[in-house]
Design a protein with these regions (language model features):
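N-terminal low-complexity, intrinsically disordered segments
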Residues: 45-76
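N-terminal assembly/attachment segments of tailed bacteriophage virion structural proteins
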Residues: 40-43, 100
Length: 329
């Protein structure tokens, strides 16, 4: 069975002092999801095929001298694909050589590219849909977008109908629940390859010597058990008021409690809430509300983190404030 580790854990196993660890550190700085999301190697060169249990076998109370009818569970196979996220960084050789440590300079110059890839990955994690963009992977929203679907019981309708709607997600990361994947035979995380000195061309066609670096990140998402993901959809940001119990306001703490109660067993993985900046800012300001008993600040891995019922609340700017209303289809 493959192991599910965060990218930081994978980097440490490869080499505690490797450049990969530095890249992962840069990734984590601008993408809080990577502090929680675990990855495992897929069983396909292009993704991962998993067997999902769709029904449990029946058990029977037996009387003496009476037999028991055989029963079996029902399963379905699901194939999740990975996407290939790539970019190139090009830097003037003269500039890179000035500080005497070319490798460190190239990595520092590449931070903008790494952050761009981070944002693209986070956006795809929440909104990727291979029926629209085949080159990406299928994210969370495409899996939880129908109130009448079987997994619609894990979509909580916050009641919003306007144009400034958002979602709050509760994801329980784990090998048997939901986790990231990378292709069979490849490496976890973002790969950096220095292509060395090349001749570059400026906007006017002029030639100059420079260094080219290739970045590649192959990743995807697989969901073993949809019961361990909850979407609080149709959250109208205009109704997030100072007093969540005021008339016309969204009682977000109550919705968060409902989400927690939908998870069958929180110990099956690492539960984390994800929301955008506006929602987490509201939650942080609620800490000093005299009525608040659920929201607090906790220290997780040396960082101060907003928590709800001791579950971390991560800020993810990839979550939109202009989502379409989630309805029954």
């Amino acid at each position: 069975m493959p192991q599910a580790l965060t990218l930081a854990d994978w980097a440490k196993r490869q080499d505690p002092n490797s450049k990969q660890a530095k890249i992962v550190e840069l990734l984590n700085q601008s993408n809080e999801i990577l502090d929680d999301m675990v990855f495992a190697e897929g069983n396909l060169p292009t993704g991962h095929r998993t067997t999902v249990r769709t029904g449990l076998p029946e058990a029977t109370w037996r009387m003496l001298n009476y037999g028991v009818q055989p029963s079996k569970s029902t399963t379905a196979q699901v194939t999740d694909s990975t996407g290939m996220l790539e970019t190139y960084s090009e830097v003037d050789k003269k500039l890179a050589d000035l500080n005497g440590n070319t490798s460190e300079f190239l990595l520092s110059e590449a931070q903008a590219f790494i952050e761009s890839m981070n944002q693209e990955m986070a956006e795809t994690l929440f909104y990727g849909d291979t029926t629209v963009d085949a080159e990406r992977f299928t994210g969370l929203s495409a899996r939880f977008n129908d109130l009448s679907a079987k997994n619609g019981v894990n979509i909580i309708d916050a009641g919003g109908t306007g144009s400034n709607l958002t979602s709050v997600w509760l994801v329980t990361w784990g090998l048997n629940t939901i986790h990231g994947i990378y292709p069979k035979g490849s490496k976890a995380g973002l790969e950096q390859q220095h292509l060395g000195e090349v001749t570059l061309t400026d906007d006017k066609g002029g030639k100059y010597q420079g260094y080219r670096t290739h970045f590649k990140w192959e990743n995807g998402l697989t969901m073993r058990d949809w019961r361990y993901v909850v979407r609080i959809a149709n959250v109208d940001l205009s109704k997030l008021t100072k007093d969540p119990e005021a008339t016309g306001a969204i009682d977000l703490p109550d919705l968060l409690i409902q989400a927690i109660e939908k998870i069958p067993n929180l110990s099956m993985g690492k539960p984390v809430f994800y929301c955008n900046q506006q929602v987490r800012s509201w939650m942080r300001r609620q800490i000093k509300n005299s009525k608040n008993v659920n929201i607090s600040m906790q220290e997780v891995a040396g960082k101060k983190v907003v928590s709800f019922d001791e579950i971390p609340v991560r800020r993810t700017d990839a979550i939109l404030t202009t989502e379409d209303q989630v309805v029954a289809k």
